[in-house]
Amino acid sequence: MEVDGEARPFLLFSKPKSSKKKPKQEAEPQVHTQPEEPPNPSPSPAIEPDLRDSDEAPAAAVTEHAGDDAAAAAVPSTFAELGLSQWLVDVCDSLGMRVPTAVQRRCIPRALEGRDVLGIAETGSGKTAAFALPILHRLGEDPYGVAALALAPTRELAAQLAEQFRALGAPLGLRCLAAIGGFDSLGQAKGLARRPHVVVATPGRIATLINDDPDLAKVFARTKFLVLDEADRVLDINFEEDLRVIFGSLPKKRQTFLFSATISDNLRSLLELSGNNSYFFEAYEGFKTVDTLKQLYIHVPPDAKELYLFYLLSKMNEDNIRSVIVFVSTCRTCQYLDFLLEELGHPAVSLHSHKPQSRRLAALHNFKSSKVPVLLATDVASRGLDIQTVDLVINYDVPRYPRDYIHRVGRTARATRGGLSISFITTQRDIRLLHEIEDVVGKQLGAYDGEMRDVNKDATKVFKARRLANMKMADEGHEDKVQARKEQKKRAQERKRKHDE
């Protein structure tokens, strides 16, 4: 993303700040009695003295990696040693967070110093707490107005972030607004006008709220923190115009936290732009999979993918598999398989962007709470979402890029538990993609060795369900939705082409 001279619409990082710190004073949360922020706050951000610019030389940029022995020796090992307020240490303990993870140990002290932070760590490594705890620490000292804006690439991830902020900030009486599509925008605009402590949003919805009512931009005039979770996806070209609106509403003097499971060229460029006073920590040691994950593939005839899927799912109890995520490449396939399994009487829920938001959240809740054993999903569920226990991942469609494969199969075999992934190989293209995946993960996938001689026993039932599912897709207008999305994507690509010219 370009930085165009003085305006710098995509300059995420603030000006270099002094590393000088005033003596730390422990502060109890000032919870429920904060005054209302004036209707027209001053455009200058209310920043603590230790974060203001000074005449002293700015702190140098710091880059560390998980394997840096010298740096690791000085890293705090408990939440109390990180410099957090005692009430936050107590909250972590009450939530079962006894020992900080690597990304938390490295990033939280730097954030408390006032640095901008870019943290790269795998899904499930505790990235949310790495940025939420420093924000809540500051809020405990000065709970006044919208202190933080956190952006996430998907509605589900934004909703999850809001839940985690509320859990961690409960003793503070935290007011957190989730501004996401699929819900009443008028109600969200009113909630934003009440100046909650933390706003968690998708870029599209928050930009729409500001465009519809430019006065809402004043709500962010004193925002101290900007967070981009799954930052490489938030910085995708599809969000560019929304981000211009959002960044134009934020003060230049702020801390910026970028966290992601994947380092991208955009993130590297932004790290260089940040210059001084930034901290980069990478706990991600390339694309790899855990040793407790058994990775298999199975050759499937092109016209029998549904048959093989139903056969594997019907063996869940026999194979002691309690939960399955089936990843597909398109929203159409996701909804189609939802209808198919419904016709076959196999309980499942689907998660994709064509689905109304309330139903998406309900589907995710039902799967996470084990009410439904099968989740059909596009890659919207491959990163960020906190789904603790998944026994089997099926790649119904092989992903185009090895990194997406890593994120998908990373939903299972978490926290030292074992797990299984099975990829359907149907075409020569799938074989090529399989070889690319093997090159990246550094190991060969094994051929599925389960019993498959009975796979055709339900062929008549499955083919009938396939016909009915396709009819339902047409009846409910899903084909029209697919076409509309294609046209929308085409227009976005055309805008990008003109912009590049």
From Swiss-Prot:
Compositional bias (Basic residues): 487-501
Motif Q motif location, chain numbering: 77-105
Official protein name in the record: DEAD-box ATP-dependent RNA helicase 36
Helicase C-terminal domain span: 292-456
Residues annotated as binding ATP: A121, E122, T123, G124, S125, G126, K127, T128
Species assigned in the record: Oryza sativa subsp. japonica
Chain intervals for the UniProt region annotation (Disordered): 1-68, 473-501
Taxonomic path: Eukaryota, Viridiplantae, Streptophyta, Embryophyta, Tracheophyta
Domain Helicase ATP-binding: from-to ranges: 108-281
GO-annotated cellular components: nucleus
Entry similarity comment: Belongs to the DEAD box helicase family. DDX49/DBP8 subfamily.
MF terms (GO), sorted A to Z: ATP binding; ATP hydrolysis activity; RNA binding; RNA helicase activity
Top EC class, one word: hydrolase
Biased composition (Pro residues): 36-46
Motif DEAD box: where in chain: 229-232
EC nos: 3.6.4.13
Record's comment describing the protein's domains: The Q motif is unique to and characteristic of the DEAD box family of RNA helicases and controls ATP binding and hydrolysis.
